């Protein structure tokens, strides 16, 4: 039997709890891929996968569900195929879209536990608020250079619950905390933190709440293997308390993302680029694939952009694009000083809608 060895450890009743459970993983990346593999292997009955992005070659070193044949595929589609092959008993639901205030509540509604595998502060606060309102346990994980963090939110213990906002009531300023795309990441680190998260999910599903990281932030330094646990309490935080308030809350602005500087649809980008002396600047690294083919884009990687302003002075309207709108916004903020007289924008959707059209 597939689960014999773990049944020997924690019993058939707990295994049945896993088989009857439903877990949603938001983000099929460096955390999400190993998380999904582990949760499927341990016997979680139903898994949901949320991610709008496609597989790229530079993902492969840490996103173990994928290989070269998956490049260009939607991450959710590629992951479902691989997970189904690994464990045909797992029920899989793919949600190939970005999580927004419009869809977050319907997306999390049917699940017992939600796991945060994102790398975006705006989505992280949105997901935390929605799970708190819907009373969904949320297993948090984050990476920074050689360190990782794990905690469990929205589970009552000692008469109260805590959320992401109790830990981080204020979002960091732009450029304070880089994403994995910007700072880089080792697959050993993302995999270790994902294993901690998966273990917390199992604890929640079988009811081992006394040992779960509730009201506790686990900090793990992978260089010296120092583990630190920090206790935290419920705070008098300001947060949306209803679905309607989530709809009205400006998450990009709260996370210091100037919405007026963003183009959010392909149609808006089309209109922007029809202007005289307009250009699309791809700030991904040279080896990142696939290349944009909807427009002729100027390739200026973020790593060298501050030395290339002269190339852009010939244009009046400049829009930056990357994978998911993070590096492009950073490029825009850099350009505001060097190109103060230009019309500068960032394309929020990233490159995916601009290829294979």
Where are these regions (language model features)?
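Conserved anion/nucleotide-ligand pocket segment
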Residues: 178-217
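Catalytic cysteine-centered active loop of the rhodanese-like fold, especially the PTP/DSP P-loop
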Residues: 26, 39, 300, 306-357
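Glycine-rich adenosine-cofactor-binding loop
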Residues: 21-40, 46-51
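E1/E1-like adenylate-forming module used to activate ubiquitin-like modifiers
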Residues: 92-94, 99, 110-193, 234
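N-terminal charged helix/coil linker that caps or initiates catalytic domains
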Residues: 1-24, 248-258
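Residue-level detector of alpha-helix initiation sites
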Residues: 30-33, 44, 54-55, 121-122, ...
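Flexible, polar/low-complexity N-terminal or interdomain linker segments that lie immediately upstream
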Residues: 221-292
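Glycine-rich phosphate-binding loop and adjoining beta1-alpha1-beta2 segment
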Residues: 50-86
